[in-house]
């Protein structure tokens, strides 16, 4: 199962705390990319945030990835389940069958 996660640092986080946690988060995501749990990761320019796509087998794994992020308590996130265009098209065609 793939999920798009958009994560933004809360505005009230002191810059000193943010500066300490950010290198830990970089290392955390390096490890997730090596494990192939994170397929792609991008910084959101001018947003103090990032977006990434995770590929997990369970909601437990998704929860672990999010919960173990060093910036967990300092960020807000939106999580969206993803499907391929082909799967979406197939579902729509089935719905529209007479």
Regions found by a protein language model. Name each.
Residues 1-98:
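Conserved, structured core segments of small domains
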């Amino acid at each position: 199962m793939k999920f798009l996660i958009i994560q933004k640092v809360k505005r009230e986080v002191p810059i000193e705390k943010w500066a300490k946690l950010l290198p830990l988060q970089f290392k955390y995501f390096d490890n997730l990319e090596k494990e192939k749990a994170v397929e792609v990761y991008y910084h959101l320019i001018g947003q103090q945030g990032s977006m990434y796509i995770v590929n997990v087998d369970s909601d437990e794994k998704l929860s672990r990835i999010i919960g173990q992020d060093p910036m967990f308590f300092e960020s807000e996130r939106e999580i969206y389940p993803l499907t391929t265009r082909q799967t979406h098209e197939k579902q729509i065609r089935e719905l529209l069958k007479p």
